[in-house]
């Protein structure tokens, strides 16, 4: 092993003279190599028996055919036994087992026909032999009395350089395919358990070793999504890199890195791994061999790839510096962000970080516009783009209603919040942060609060904070706003659009919204109750603090109204139907209202005792269809009564009525519906017309089914659709002593006692969470029932409907005003930019915020195009960049480093 750049780079096992040459392609040789071996099976999935070491060695009987032992399985088992022996304090056994494993690997390597795998096996054999030598030297250098207290030498970093697996290109090869970082993929078995210690433990990313300054660092988080979804997201990023090259210069891609963090090795889909293997950014067999004997937490693959622009392989997108981080265990999306921020970003120190969910496809300029927004205004700490439904199916009410909801939320809510300076949530599916704004300083800052649910036990968090951290992105936004001594704000970038898939069935929608609703409710309460920090701790100006105070008053009233949304929806139905049906069809009125209340009660029962699945889908489907029809009938009656000027009388004569003028009637309709459409039209979003009917049909479902299910499952802190099961190299291992039977039995008893204690604690926590759920659910239902009772018995229909109309009017007027002001600011900024452009100032002002090496390449012309040409000697260039002219300091440093390797 030879140390290089703070890590350890494995040698080629040249000392084994008997081993044949691998015959691997070199950077100067052919760069097309195809692996025909199946990769669906990994030897790290083979567990060994949970027995003492001495008993497990019984399979190595003298009469056993030696050839039967010379297999991958035998070598892996020996390495696992050696690692167990080392951890249990039996170094002599570990030395012998490591030596035996190395011998087996050498013999297996001689028979391996695949040259790449042969090289990996020989390299692993060398590392295992080295480990045996290190343990042997340590054992005889430490006095016997101090041997138990002394620590053996730390296991060196297991790292492998792998020639890229490339497709047989049909036509031109990638423009930069001969550069060293394109011809080799690097694999590292990361054993660091705490991502914060990633750099301290000697691990270093390849772009960091190359001396590249990463300005934009993008993460794609994924779980078990298909390869086509990852391909779509990467292509969206590649299109943005192409636009960045037009704006910032040919080498803009060198300042951008992409980290794909996959949550769990056994959870990753086969199609996704196949896609990455086709790119040359994943190799399961090399991962299996290299990680033998290592307590792997993360499998790290690093490669620079180019995606093809078309099926003919005639042109390519700019290179992507890709980091594929495959976590060994499934620990959740937040843990993936923990690796991205605390391990990778803390090492690279990027200027901006961009969060993208796999399957979300950024527009061709969306990422660039997010970054440009923060470049132009150094006060902006975070930005959000528009999340749009990808190809909405208007014939599916579930999808169409979400399309309407997403559009109106962006047009009215995010626009208003952007004008005021605080966006309550920057969605993790597509948003960007200035890393300086969220980075921890001495363990304090927005990021530590963002990850608090990972660093604090569920028992210590409690049910309130546990639900609050289901919306950890909302906590991050508030911590960013209220950061001590700083005046960070947030901004909505309207034309930074990213398209994503949404739940297509009601069952999937219920699962998703349970976490959203509970998290947003408790996170909202947290932000409102801690707003004083904005005045006491933040560095915002007095005028900004006053504006933020008004915004938080608005949010407080909004939270109160959302609490009583269940009862107010029923009261609206009750009064409209009573005024229409009571005098002529009292029986029909009683039946409709009775079924409605019975459905609400049934939803509570189903939500408490069942998870949404196929067996409960029939009830939920009937409920949402019935309540949707009631909603449409009430809407038609209201519109008809307004247009036909029909007068109705409240049957309860003893209640004082409120007069409603024609102006108030027209104003109520205009503010309730007209301002929503007006906001959409001035923003150019005419597609909302195609989904309005579906949204109002689904509105009772959003209020009743989703709301009741959310409050009925406050004890559930999971993400709903993704479990947090763990998956390691095999079955859990029984702790082992030094071979003494009594010690092994005693240790096993201690483990069993610890398991029982943990199980009891888990049961206590679960019971306390369920008690909190039941109490809050009961309080919510009782308060809504009391409100319904008071309104129906003490307030006339005209007074109640007039009150609701005014409340809706005030909120919609505020939202419309914010939407219009946001649009005015946007138009003014564009007009100002155009005017400055004609005077030659705009480009210089924007250019001043860019890195020095980019300023010379900045082009003000929006008509710049990307071209791929061929020089006279047949060599390709990308936007004027000749592959033979890789003369930048970072490229030269990187090329020299790879040649030394």
From Swiss-Prot:
<feature type="transmembrane region" description="Helical">
    <location>
        <begin position="588"/>
        <end position="608"/>
    </location>
</feature>
<feature type="transmembrane region" description="Helical">
    <location>
        <begin position="516"/>
        <end position="535"/>
    </location>
</feature>
<dbReference type="GO" id="GO:0004100">
    <property type="term" value="F:chitin synthase activity"/>
</dbReference>
<keyword id="KW-0808">Transferase</keyword>
<keyword id="KW-0325">Glycoprotein</keyword>
<feature type="transmembrane region" description="Helical">
    <location>
        <begin position="560"/>
        <end position="580"/>
    </location>
</feature>
<feature type="transmembrane region" description="Helical">
    <location>
        <begin position="624"/>
        <end position="644"/>
    </location>
</feature>
<keyword id="KW-1133">Transmembrane helix</keyword>
<keyword id="KW-1003">Cell membrane</keyword>
<dbReference type="Pfam" id="PF08407">
    <property type="entry name" value="Chitin_synth_1N"/>
</dbReference>
<feature type="domain" description="MIT">
    <location>
        <begin position="73"/>
        <end position="137"/>
    </location>
</feature>
<dbReference type="InterPro" id="IPR004835">
    <property type="entry name" value="Chitin_synth"/>
</dbReference>
<dbReference type="InterPro" id="IPR036181">
    <property type="entry name" value="MIT_dom_sf"/>
</dbReference>
<feature type="transmembrane region" description="Helical">
    <location>
        <begin position="688"/>
        <end position="708"/>
    </location>
</feature>
<protein>
    <recommendedName>
        <fullName>Chitin synthase 2</fullName>
        <ecNumber>2.4.1.16</ecNumber>
    </recommendedName>
</protein>
<keyword id="KW-0812">Transmembrane</keyword>
<dbReference type="GO" id="GO:0005886">
    <property type="term" value="C:plasma membrane"/>
</dbReference>
<dbReference type="GO" id="GO:0071555">
    <property type="term" value="P:cell wall organization"/>
</dbReference>
<keyword id="KW-0472">Membrane</keyword>
<keyword id="KW-0328">Glycosyltransferase</keyword>
<dbReference type="InterPro" id="IPR029044">
    <property type="entry name" value="Nucleotide-diphossugar_trans"/>
</dbReference>
<feature type="glycosylation site" description="N-linked (GlcNAc...) asparagine">
    <location>
        <position position="863"/>
    </location>
</feature>
<feature type="transmembrane region" description="Helical">
    <location>
        <begin position="663"/>
        <end position="683"/>
    </location>
</feature>
<dbReference type="Pfam" id="PF04212">
    <property type="entry name" value="MIT"/>
</dbReference>
<comment type="function">
    <text>Polymerizes chitin, a structural polymer of the cell wall and septum, by transferring the sugar moiety of UDP-GlcNAc to the non-reducing end of the growing chitin polymer. Seems not to be involved in mycelial growth, nor in sporangial production, zoospore release and virulence.</text>
</comment>
<feature type="glycosylation site" description="N-linked (GlcNAc...) asparagine">
    <location>
        <position position="882"/>
    </location>
</feature>
<dbReference type="GO" id="GO:0006031">
    <property type="term" value="P:chitin biosynthetic process"/>
</dbReference>
<comment type="similarity">
    <text>Belongs to the chitin synthase family. Class II subfamily.</text>
</comment>
<dbReference type="InterPro" id="IPR004834">
    <property type="entry name" value="Chitin_synth_fun"/>
</dbReference>
<feature type="glycosylation site" description="N-linked (GlcNAc...) asparagine">
    <location>
        <position position="487"/>
    </location>
</feature>
<feature type="transmembrane region" description="Helical">
    <location>
        <begin position="803"/>
        <end position="823"/>
    </location>
</feature>
<feature type="region of interest" description="Disordered">
    <location>
        <begin position="1"/>
        <end position="52"/>
    </location>
</feature>
<feature type="transmembrane region" description="Helical">
    <location>
        <begin position="775"/>
        <end position="795"/>
    </location>
</feature>
<dbReference type="InterPro" id="IPR013616">
    <property type="entry name" value="Chitin_synth_N"/>
</dbReference>
<keyword id="KW-0961">Cell wall biogenesis/degradation</keyword>
<dbReference type="InterPro" id="IPR007330">
    <property type="entry name" value="MIT_dom"/>
</dbReference>
<dbReference type="Pfam" id="PF01644">
    <property type="entry name" value="Chitin_synth_1"/>
</dbReference>
<feature type="compositionally biased region" description="Basic and acidic residues">
    <location>
        <begin position="31"/>
        <end position="48"/>
    </location>
</feature>
